[in-house]
Amino acid sequence: MKNIAILGSTGSIGTQTLQVIDANPERFNVEVLTANNQVELLAQQARKFKPNMVVIGNEAKYSELTELLKDEDIKVYAGSEAIAQVVQTSTIDVVVTAMVGYSGLLPTINAIKAGKTIALANKETLVVAGDLINRLVEEYKVAILPVDSEHSAIFQCLVGEHNNPVEKILLTASGGPFRGRDYEYLKSVTAAQALKHPNWSMGAKVTIDSASMMNKGFEAIEAKWLFGVKPSQIEVLVHPQSVVHSMVQFQDGNIKAQLGVPDMRLPIQYALTYPERVHSEILRLDFGIYPDLTFEKPDVTTFRNLGLAYEAMNRGGNAPCVLNAANEIMVAAFLKDEISFTAMSDVIERTMEKVSYIVQPTLEDYIASDQEGRRIAKEEFLNLKSQI
């Protein structure tokens, strides 16, 4: 029986993680659930799964959550500091980091220092501070098991290949809802259009990142840190069917690929049960439904965010941290229809140019770079609005 903490239990990954746990009650026990704002859903989950503790990030909702759970024997806490602290609870075996964005960094660091296995769904942790995270993982000798479908695929392809050098990682991308569209078309797309992903069911932030291909850029950076490869060894391939989740090419020229239906419960379950493979009722892949599996190069001229992510990855230091900070500000603005889809890249690029570059950042440097990146992105965004 594994005791699980889920950070971000009310989001897309969090709710699907609970579905996996619900289907395997003899294997998993829910120890901690956290959410940021969705207090009613968090309370509903707590009543069903009976964790020892729940945390609501938004402190203004603490009394509401306490009232909803007054008849349950569950400890209730509030605030980001509480989220960062509960992961250190001695009874926890695995921490599922399903929070979105930069907010996942400090809880993940604390969980590593507490010796917990990390089921990593919060890619921004490695985007922002991959070098620091890898050093901590080595120091505290913990395992990071990827939950992202692409990184789970790469991880699975590498099982049994410990001594065999990787030549290249082929990171697949659906291409999002705007695949094949030109730059002029993208100038006028709306948030509602961008939120209609062709293959995956995800939260709003990740869906917008997928549409802009920033998500794939983040995943390339994540792959660099997870698998110890150079940026030049990570090739993005657009694969509209989302059946081949990623591939690994070895130095002898052979390629291994991992395939499956586009259902996040598959990589979630693999991360939770690793190294075992446990039966699931998830739909099996029917090749008759997918007679053609196609691949194409990404259009980095139109989808500039992918190029910006590679630029940040090649530069290293605090550049990916700044990239993420600016992107979070821009996605929030785009979701409110305050900025155009293409202008997001303009602001991100300017922010990356203006924030002070640090070659080997400390945790304090990463925190400061995130703050500076957000401040400058807001300034650049306001400057852009004033010119319209």
Where are these regions (language model features)?
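Catalytic, metal-anchored helix/loop core of enzyme active sites in primary metabolism
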Residues: M1-I388
